[in-house]
């Protein structure tokens, strides 16, 4: 698997409800229909290790069969819509989004 992680910073307290409404009702549904995607998951972080604050607020995981499958998805209209919406969210809610991409190791019950 080849996985893209979109890692969002925390919006201000005043913007959290609006950010969540937009993320769950608009952004995630747009992202969920990107072609060639094998799996789409989102997480809203609430806790950090040992009770600390989490280092980020939201994480989206988009898994593809290969780097080439992701590259093909990046050429789609759906991808363009997700990118445009992410840019609008960054501006509107004064957040950042970092992206990490790479091959996914799978542990099938043994050591990696």
Describe the residue ranges of each PLM region:
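Macromolecular interaction modules
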Residues: 1-112
């Amino acid at each position: 698997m080849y996985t893209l992680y979109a890692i969002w910073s925390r919006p201000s307290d005043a913007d959290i409800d609006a950010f969540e409404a937009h993320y769950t009702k608009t952004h995630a549904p747009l992202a969920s229909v990107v072609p060639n995607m094998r799996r789409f998951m989102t997480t809203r972080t609430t806790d950090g290790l040992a009770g600390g604050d989490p280092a980020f607020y939201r994480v989206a995981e988009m898994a593809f069969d290969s780097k080439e499958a992701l590259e093909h998805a990046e050429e789609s209209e759906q991808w363009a819509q997700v990118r445009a919406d992410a840019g609008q969210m960054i501006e509107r809610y004064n957040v950042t989004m970092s992206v990490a991409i790479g091959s996914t190791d799978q542990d099938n019950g043994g050591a990696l």
